[in-house]
């Protein structure tokens, strides 16, 4: 077990990496509820700081620091909004870590093989909306490996597949519509 200062240093370094480097990874999101069988959703994530792009089979979402882009290939519709902080957190679970650190009890443990640090954040105040946030970080490079969010009877797990830091461009966080795409601009 690490001291609280060591845990906060690991989290701070991890969050600094997310702010200063471009993370890219394929992933699987598993959503499990007590009454239903778990559902798996594959996708790809690219993020740098608050900016991100998520591509999944039925939706594409991007945030460039100001505008949220949500594209549905099924309807060929692109919706533009100015998202709330909560909408951003729901779109990219890695952003939760930064928001939760100041308002949570933090517990750390090392994986059995010693290659990962597992950080559990439990809100001090249950009005936060989640019961538990578990982050697994690879020790060698502070790369996120998985995030688990427990909300009531629902558990969502994001498992990264071969995450890496890459060179990224700001244009990566914008979705440009095709000529015939319907654009629903809801920005204020």
Which role fits each region the language model picked out?
Residues 83-115:
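Flexible, surface-exposed loop/linker segments and immediately adjacent secondary-structure boundaries
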Residues 27-29, 53-57, 118-125, 146-150:
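Short beta-strand segments that buttress and anchor functional surface loops
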Residues 46-48, 109-111, 136-140:
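Short beta-strand micro-motifs enriched in acidic
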Residues 1-39, 46-51, 126, 171, ...:
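N-terminal leader/targeting segments and the immediate start of mature chains
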Residues 113-115, 124-132, 139-188:
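Non-transmembrane domains of secretory- and envelope-associated proteins
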């Amino acid at each position: 077990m690490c001291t609280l200062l060591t845990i906060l240093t690991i989290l701070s370094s991890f969050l600094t990496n997310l702010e200063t480097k471009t993370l890219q990874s394929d992933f699987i999101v598993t959503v499990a509820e007590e009454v239903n069988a778990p559902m798996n959703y594959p996708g790809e994530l690219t993020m740098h700081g608050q900016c991100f792009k998520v591509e999944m089979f039925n939706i594409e979402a991007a945030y460039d620091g100001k505008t949220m882009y949500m594209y549905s290939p099924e309807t060929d519709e692109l919706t533009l909004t100015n998202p709330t902080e909560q909408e951003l957190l729901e779109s990219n679970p890695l952003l939760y870590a930064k928001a939760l650190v100041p308002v949570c009890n933090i517990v750390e443990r090392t994986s059995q093989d010693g290659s990962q640090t597992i950080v559990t954040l439990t809100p001090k105040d249950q009005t936060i909306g989640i019961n538990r946030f578990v982050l697994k970080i690879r020790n060698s490079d502070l790369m996120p490996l998985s995030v688990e969010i427990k909300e009531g009877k629902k558990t969502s797990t994001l498992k990264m597949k071969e995450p890496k830091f890459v060179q990224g461009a700001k244009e990566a966080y914008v979705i440009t519509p095709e000529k015939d795409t319907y654009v629903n601009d809801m920005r204020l």
